[in-house]
Each structure stands twice: as structure tokens, then as C-alpha cells.
Amino acid sequence: MKAGALELGEGSKTSIPRGGVNRGISILDFILRLITIIGTLGSAIAMGTTNETLPFFTQFTQFRAEYDDLPTFTFFVIANSIVSGYLVLSLPMSILHIVRSGARASRIVLIFFDTAMLALLTAAASAASAIVYLAHKGNAQANWFAICQQFKSFCERISGSLIGSFGGIILFILLVLLSAVALSRC
């Protein structure tokens, strides 16, 4: 083949059919949704079951830390639960995209709701990470002391639940990008 033939667009005429690529994208979309369910549901369960009681107490006070002591953590649990529920409900639509890779309208709906759930998850994880930072470091100017020196198990669990949630955010970004690529190829 001459170099001039390539410049004229007479190169290899073989190409991958669009349906096959879209089917591969749809399978990857389904797998990413399953992994995201595990991350967000795990984060909600880890945060929702977090509590610790210190072994010492005064005559009137027992020192205890629970996730529902702070409204931000409650919002975090609710948001992760909503996102997990949405992901479970979106699995049939993802299966539909594997079977019918040219389904355009349902992909648009998924992009819209995936973006909304991404925003909700980002808001919850960001708010919770600010409180986790205060729990670890405190704020001397506001007279807020770090509690993680006393409540070690509590702080380890709330920090771990943030990891799953931020992993879910990254996977949601990939889901939106994959849906956009699949939509552009329809």
C-alpha cells in the first residue's frame, strides 16, 4: 500500500461494528454499577453502624460517640442509601442496554439520573469528610477538640466509610462518561 493511498483514505476498510463496541460499553457499565452498589451500600452500612462508648464515665455522664450525633453523618447515610437504591433500580435498564445497544432515550435518562446521584453523593461525602477532618484534627480557634484520640474505633470506621463513598464518586464519573460515549456512538 502506498503512502498516497493512506492520505486519500484508502487504508484498511475493516472496522469494528458499532453494536459490538456499544455492547462492550454496556457490559462495562453494568459491572461498574455493581461495584458502585458495593461501595455506596458498604459506606452506608459502615457509617450507620458506627458507635463507640468509652470504658470510663462520670457519675452522671457516659462518653459515647454515634453517627447520628451529627446531622452530617445522618445525611451521609441517607444519601448513600438513596444512591444504592437508585443503582439497584438502574440495573434492569443497564441490562436492556446490553441486549439493545442502540437504546438512545434510556441512555439519556440514565445520564440525567446518574449525574443527579453523582451530585448527591458528592455533597454527602464532602460534608462528611469535613466533619471527619474536624474529628481528627479539631479546630483550636473554635475550641473544638479532636475526638479521635479517645474514640479510635469510631474514627477508623467513619474514615473507612468515606473511602467507599469517594470510590463510588469516581465510578459514577466513569459511568456518566461511558454513557456519553455510548450515546455518541448510537
Curated annotation (Swiss-Prot):
Parts of the chain on the Extracellular side: 48-74, 129-161
GO biological process: cell wall modification; cell-cell junction assembly
Glycosylated residues (UniProt): 51
Topology versus the membrane: Multi-pass membrane protein
TM spans (from-to): 27-47, 75-95, 108-128, 162-182
Topological domain spans for side Cytoplasmic: 1-26, 96-107, 183-186
A cellular component term, taken from the record's GO annotations: plasma membrane
UniProt-listed InterPro entries: CASP/CASPL, CASP_dom, CASPL
Keyword entries, A-Z: Cell membrane, Cell wall biogenesis/degradation, Glycoprotein, Membrane, Transmembrane, Transmembrane helix
Role: Regulates membrane-cell wall junctions and localized cell wall deposition. Required for establishment of the Casparian strip membrane domain (CSD) and the subsequent formation of Casparian strips, a cell wall modification of the root endodermis that determines an apoplastic barrier between the intraorganismal apoplasm and the extraorganismal apoplasm and prevents lateral diffusion.
Subunit structure: Homodimer and heterodimers.
NCBIfam families with a match to the protein in the record: A_tha_TIGR01569
Protein's recorded name: Casparian strip membrane protein 3
